[in-house]
Amino acid sequence: MAAKEVVFGNDARVKMLAGVNILANAVKVTLGPKGRNVVLEKSFGAPLITKDGVSVAKEIELEDKFENMGAQMVKEVASKANDAAGDGTTTATVLAQAIVNEGLKAVAAGMNPMDLKRGIDKAVAAAVVELKALSQECADSKAIAQVGTISANSDESIGDIIATAMEKVGKEGVITVEEGQALENELDVVEGMQFDRGYLSPYFINKPETGAVELDNPFVLLVDKKISNIRELLPILEGLAKTGKPLLIVAEDVEGEALATLVVNNMRGIVKVAAVKAPGFGDRRKAMLQDIAILTGGTVIAEEIGLELEKATLEDLGTAKRVVITKDNTTIIDGNGAEEQIKARVGQIKQQIEETTSDYDREKLQERMAKLAGGVAVIKVGAATEVEMKEKKARVEDALHATRAAVEEGVVPGGGVALVRVASKIANVDVANEDQKHGVVIALRAMEAPLRQIATNAGEEASVVANTVKNGSGNFGYNAGNDSYGDMLEMGILDPTKVTRSALQFAASVAGLMITTEAMVAELPKADAPDMGGMGGGMGGMGMM
């Protein structure tokens, strides 16, 4: 085991604080509408230019091991805020820096670190309650667009496109962000349920101009096995021929004689039919077939539940308004399933999302839920260069997370105002002693830090702005974008409650641990091994003649 270096007391705290300040100072320049960019060197390709706090934090590694420990702990604050709410990473970093700096001053002055931490924790718990009381519901598209705009560093086009996407696919719908090909942002919306399986034979195509199969008011047959014998399908096909309606078959596979017969019947116009493979594999395929069954009001024909294809009737089939099948995708539009059953299925998938520990499973479950709940929207980010594309894509992703958080827990006045208003209401929180009281004061001072930093980044005197805002009431605050004061909600400057709450809780949690640190342990640098000795001279007796 390698030898360790141990530092104690004030020496440890000074080193740790230096690391905290280096990382926080690099991150906090990005805060607010007039925040600056940070350029990150990449081992290959062009440097990355960003205003995303967590991206900056993740890049920072310090040479001094004790300073690096301080930096890594603040990095943890940014990462946790990002994981919980998807935004607010810079705010969380600014709050953590303020609490650590004030807290370590108090420890150096002889106060009890544990009581300071208890005071900070009490203040934060009271602040969270007040934040929830201050919160307002974020229901309409205008408010969603405003939240997106603020999170995307005052880029209105991003806020608007996210609001439009949410309007199209609903609050539960899946919205993904991709790199586009154009200069402007674009929005693609896939309505209905789409899955990545295309037609099994090009002979099913009935729209040669688009290379697609389009079925109007079709029946939908769902089978959880391979179909290779046409006799299994005959009862269904005979019943279908009488109705004159088209049929979509979704099965594990349709092959051999069964596929050939379907193709021939389709080409002759006896029955209008198309077949696709079921999406997914294994248990996920069974679940997705059940999703389609609920969406279309049909039944999955599966032998494990005692249903046989030969005995299936038209009552077992689902129906939809329209189905479009391309080479790669199948889209079922306006399935005729019962609304209550669809809602119940969505609720069931929601429960699974909460319980799963796998990110991959969570993503797939969210996709399934979105396909049932409304659809999928794809925001294609446009930019002139690759460097701009990466920076803009990161902002769109942040804004998307912020709007989701706003829909979930509501919004509070932005620009750091919410924390200032909350601080004024919790000044008299109950404490056991003077040191705990000072812990509360530390938390209250820290809650002003985001507002002060926004003002500093805008080139204003932080103390003047902070005092002006504190002397106001309600939603009155400072708009750094146009250097004016007024009602933050009316000016459209909103922060998601969840983002503000998460930033405060994670900052206080990690900062409290740092204040109570008394020793730090790190590996000593390994001594370099000596270089190999040089080779000996040439062979003897080889002199020149």
Curated annotation (Swiss-Prot):
Top class in the EC scheme: isomerase
Source species, domain of life: Bacteria
Signal peptide start and end residues: none
Full protein name: Chaperonin GroEL
Pfam family name, one: Cpn60_TCP1
UniProt keyword Chaperone, yes or no: yes
Species this chain originates from: Shewanella amazonensis (strain ATCC BAA-1098 / SB2B)
Primary role: Together with its co-chaperonin GroES, plays an essential role in assisting protein folding. The GroEL-GroES system forms a nano-cage that allows encapsulation of the non-native substrate proteins and provides a physical environment optimized to promote and accelerate protein folding.
